[in-house]
Amino acid sequence: MASMNVKKGDRVVVLAGKDKGKKGEVIAAMPSEQRVIVQGVNLVKRHTRPSATSQGGIVEKEASIHVSNVAHEDPKDGKATRIGHKILEDGRKVRVARRSGEVIDR
């Protein structure tokens, strides 16, 4: 299985589905399932039972979406971009936005 270009903490744009066009930060990445959880995107309602620790009721939380439905947000203009890799002079391998050439890795 191919590795994912999306990591926890990346800013992404949703390309398809009911939340198309929304932007958010990746909360969790699941490489084995090729899925990501994006903050504020794909919200679902969970009906939870009361327990000793939690009150219970209807809780709204983010569900995962497939990685093919998101793209990185270009640091320059905020639009969706593809990702390339580049080796810097100091030997570090970094991810770069194909749209602007801007380095995405922190």
From Swiss-Prot:
UniProt keywords, alphabetically: Ribonucleoprotein, Ribosomal protein, RNA-binding, rRNA-binding
Gene Ontology MF term list:
rRNA binding; structural constituent of ribosome
- Pfam families the record matches: KOW (PF00467), ribosomal_L24 (PF17136)
UniProt-listed GO biological process terms: translation
UniProt xrefs under InterPro entries: KOW (IPR005824), Rib_uL2_dom2 (IPR014722), Ribosomal_uL24 (IPR003256), Ribosomal_uL24_CS (IPR005825), Ribosomal_uL24_KOW (IPR041988), Translation_prot_SH3-like_sf (IPR008991)
Instruction: Give the matching SUPFAM superfamilies.
Output: Translation proteins SH3-like domain (SSF50104)
CC per GO annotation? ribonucleoprotein complex; ribosome
At the top level of its lineage, which domain of life is listed?
Bacteria
UniProt cross-references to PANTHER family, sorted A to Z: MITOCHONDRIAL RIBOSOMAL PROTEIN L24
Record's family?
Belongs to the universal ribosomal protein uL24 family.
What is the role of this chain? One of two assembly initiator proteins, it binds directly to the 5'-end of the 23S rRNA, where it nucleates assembly of the 50S subunit.
Subunit field text: Part of the 50S ribosomal subunit.
Q: What is this protein called?
A: Large ribosomal subunit protein uL24
Where does this protein come from, organism-wise?
A: Paramagnetospirillum magneticum (strain ATCC 700264 / AMB-1)
State the organism's lineage: Bacteria, Pseudomonadati, Pseudomonadota, Alphaproteobacteria, Rhodospirillales
